[in-house]
């Protein structure tokens, strides 16, 4: 039931709000370095030393609360297990990456190859867990249903890897990723309620609760960042939720911000290589472009709050449009 999910969300939010300050104190007590700041963005100088890995708190709390709730309310289904597994495993990848950077002072963290291999393995296991409860290999595009058979396994891997990294790129300024993802997940919560998929709804609402609790400390000026442990987990979670709700295509609208952020990086890199050093944007991902003045020529651009609000509203509007189209077909 919806009420069960709301209760789980509130509990997750409260525990996260209680847990984050203690996590911040741990970082300060151990004198651990925070997330590296961007030298080209002068506004970020004040962020030096800010603790990271805050995603560890809301991820763990969301996982524990949703698991207990699923067992208590009888929602421990293959769909729930799949969503839970993906969220947890992508968090593990992010945690290892953050751990190497923060605790072992290895700036690169996990190598790109290590991350990719881990994400592919998680995608393969996710496919088998998903297939245990869902026998069809159908991708839903508006009113069309395309059966891609064995290639569905490849689709799941690409979908998970793509969206996890897209959300990771979006997590670049205070509060941006946490609320943008919360808005995206709210759209999927609506779909889950309408289709009475309360097993998936339970974990969706738990994660939203965790994000709201985290935002209390992550808004400008942020006292803590979520790190890869949070952003990679959220991206993978969004991807698998869209699959479990048979609404894969909607993520292209609901997650348009993540798509734009990713495309800005890809275009910048390609153009830079082709022109021998020229740039399309002042800096990517594109939220930094707006911070640095955008195409206006000004030395200082939008504030972090302005970027946040514009991106949140953009996500909210496109989410409503996606839902309208989804239910129309």
Swiss-Prot record:
E.C. no: 2.7.8.13
Localization (cell): Cell membrane
Involved pathway(s): Cell wall biogenesis; peptidoglycan biosynthesis
One GO cellular component, as annotated: plasma membrane
The keyword Transmembrane helix is annotated on this UniProt entry: yes
Ranges that cross the membrane: 1-21, 53-73, 76-96, 109-129, 141-161, 175-195, 198-218, 237-257, 309-329
Principal subcellular localisation of the protein: membrane
Membrane topology: Multi-pass membrane protein
Reaction(s) the record says it catalyses: UDP-N-acetyl-alpha-D-muramoyl-L-alanyl-gamma-D-glutamyl-L-lysyl-D-alanyl-D-alanine + di-trans,octa-cis-undecaprenyl phosphate = Mur2Ac(oyl-L-Ala-gamma-D-Glu-L-Lys-D-Ala-D-Ala)-di-trans,octa-cis-undecaprenyl diphosphate + UMP
Keyword presence, tRNA-binding: no
Enzyme class: transferase
A single BP term in Gene Ontology: peptidoglycan biosynthetic process
Pfam family, one: MraY_sig1
Gene Ontology MF annotations: metal ion binding; phospho-N-acetylmuramoyl-pentapeptide-transferase activity
Keyword tags: Cell cycle, Cell division, Cell membrane, Cell shape, Cell wall biogenesis/degradation, Magnesium, Membrane, Metal-binding, Peptidoglycan synthesis, Transferase, Transmembrane, Transmembrane helix
UniProt cross-references to InterPro entries, sorted A to Z: Glycosyl_transferase_4 (IPR000715), PNAcMuramoyl-5peptid_Trfase (IPR003524), PNAcMuramoyl-5peptid_Trfase_CS (IPR018480)
Organism domain of life: Bacteria
Entry cofactors: Mg(2+)
Similarity comment text for this entry: Belongs to the glycosyltransferase 4 family. MraY subfamily.
Function: Catalyzes the initial step of the lipid cycle reactions in the biosynthesis of the cell wall peptidoglycan: transfers peptidoglycan precursor phospho-MurNAc-pentapeptide from UDP-MurNAc-pentapeptide onto the lipid carrier undecaprenyl phosphate, yielding undecaprenyl-pyrophosphoryl-MurNAc-pentapeptide, known as lipid I.
HAMAP family in UniProt: MraY
Entry protein name: Phospho-N-acetylmuramoyl-pentapeptide-transferase
Name of the gene encoding the protein in the UniProt record: mraY
